[in-house]
């Protein structure tokens, strides 16, 4: 049985105009092979397998952009003309979203290498800082202060990242951070396959992150849930932080309401509909 890379097959069979576009569709979870979702572009599949592309065409280079887009809409964040950073940039979904919302410059920071989409690598507004650990970045590294930062990191807790980001922000700077329960809860609270399903653990994690944010001088200004789950099916949350202004009262009842709504909407499927 002859096999071929899935991204190559998508191009050969006319589902995508280029391998770059094919990769985006695959990483967005929009490609089914014999009705099974495949999200790795390099996966080899039988050439006679039935391919199907589902869902609307993504407006960003990866589905990550949908997460930030929801946060910006819910929180009313404005990026026009601002200098920003995408911390944990990966393919650059957040970076793309920022640019489409008028950001003047985006520092795409990631410890990985070769992940940033070519469209963004070749955009003069993007500073590609791959192979860079955010904890090693200083205002001197950038040569300027940030008006805005997004945080979407894996295998590290936000309590290690938020203090660093606070030092990089200009007066009045803002942050939208993705809270991932699987990387905030202790190992004993993470379930099979790295998924945290217990809403009570989600609430605890959010409260922990809020406490860290406040300790660093941030004013919590908004909280919502991500419209799409993480790769393994984890429900994630978006936290809006400001360095100035009045804080929103995020008591236990408020957090409980957000978590309950997230599970009601997202449990059993990967995205809002």
What does each model-found stretch correspond to?
Residues 80-90:
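Conserved class I S-adenosyl-L-methionine
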Residues 92-93, 114:
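Glycine-rich SAM-binding Motif I of class I
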Residues 97-105:
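Conserved S-adenosyl-L-methionine
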Residues 159-176:
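A short glycine-rich, Lys/Arg-flanked "PGG" loop and its adjoining helix->strand segment in the class I
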Residues 181-198:
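Short, glycine-/aromatic-enriched active-site segment of Class I SAM-dependent methyltransferases
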Residues 235-273:
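Flexible, glycine-/basic-rich loop-and-beta segments that form/coincide
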């Amino acid at each position: 049985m002859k096999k071929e890379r899935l991204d190559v097959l998508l191009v050969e069979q006319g589902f995508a105009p280029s391998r770059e576009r094919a990769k985006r569709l695959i990483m967005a979870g929009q490609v089914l092979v014999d009705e099974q979702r495949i999200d790795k572009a390099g996966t080899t599949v039988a050439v006679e397998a039935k391919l199907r592309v589902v869902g609307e065409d993504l407006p960003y280079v990866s589905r990550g952009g949908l997460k930030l887009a929801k946060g910006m809409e819910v929180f009313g964040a404005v990026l026009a003309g601002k200098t920003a950073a995408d911390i944990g940039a990966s393919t650059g979904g957040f970076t793309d979203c920022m640019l489409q919302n008028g950001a003047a410059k985006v520092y795409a920071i990631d410890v990985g290498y070769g992940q940033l989409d070519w469209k963004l690598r070749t955009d003069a507004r993007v500073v590609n800082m791959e192979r860079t650990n955010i904890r090693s970045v200083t205002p001197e590294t950038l040569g300027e202060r940030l008006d805005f930062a997004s945080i979407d990191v894996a295998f590290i807790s936000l309590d290690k990242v938020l203090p660093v980001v606070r030092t990089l922000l200009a007066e009045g700077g803002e942050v939208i951070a993705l809270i991932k329960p699987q990387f905030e809860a202790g190992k004993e609270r993470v379930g099979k396959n790295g998924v945290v399903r217990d809403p009570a653990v989600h609430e605890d994690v959010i409260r922990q992150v809020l406490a860290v944010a406040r300790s660093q001088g941030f004013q919590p200004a908004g909280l919502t849930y991500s419209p799409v789950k993480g790769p393994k099916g984890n429900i994630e949350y978006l936290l809006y932080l400001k360095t100035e202004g009045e804080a929103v009262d995020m008591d236990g009842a408020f957090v409980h309401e957000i978590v309950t709504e997230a599970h009601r909407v997202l449990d059993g499927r990967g995205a809002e509909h």
